[in-house]
Amino acid sequence: MLVLTRKQSEAIQIGEDIEIEVIAIEGEQVKLGIRAPKSVDIYRKEIYVDITNQNNEAAIIDKNLLQFLKNNNS
């Protein structure tokens, strides 16, 4: 993991298309601004984990439903 120190209004560049800027520092919170192409999905980590878990659960349900339908058509 790369660890960087940035002050307010400073930024980091990821590749050619993504820039992350420190907008504000308020107590224990840091506000970040992210400039990226619209084709890049950006989520808070906890939201991304929830989406991934829900997709995995849906895939299991779909697989079970498909197996059920196959067994009942035979």
UniProtKB/Swiss-Prot annotation:
SUPFAM superfamilies noted in UniProt: CsrA-like
Main subcellular localisation: cytoplasm
Localization of this protein: Cytoplasm
A Pfam short name: CsrA
Recorded coiled-coil stretches: none
InterPro entries in the cross-refs: CsrA (IPR003751), CsrA_sf (IPR036107)
GO biological process, one term: mRNA catabolic process
Signal peptide: none
GO cellular component terms listed in the entry, alphabetical order: cytosol
Keyword tags: Bacterial flagellum biogenesis, Cytoplasm, Repressor, RNA-binding, Translation regulation
Molecular function as annotated in GO: mRNA 5'-UTR binding
HAMAP family named among the record's database cross-references: CsrA
Role description: A translational regulator that binds mRNA to regulate translation initiation and/or mRNA stability. Usually binds in the 5'-UTR at or near the Shine-Dalgarno sequence preventing ribosome-binding, thus repressing translation. Its main target seems to be the major flagellin gene, while its function is anatagonized by FliW.
Subunit details: Homodimer; the beta-strands of each monomer intercalate to form a hydrophobic core, while the alpha-helices form wings that extend away from the core.
Family named by the database record: Belongs to the CsrA/RsmA family.
Protein's recorded name: Translational regulator CsrA
Underlying gene: csrA
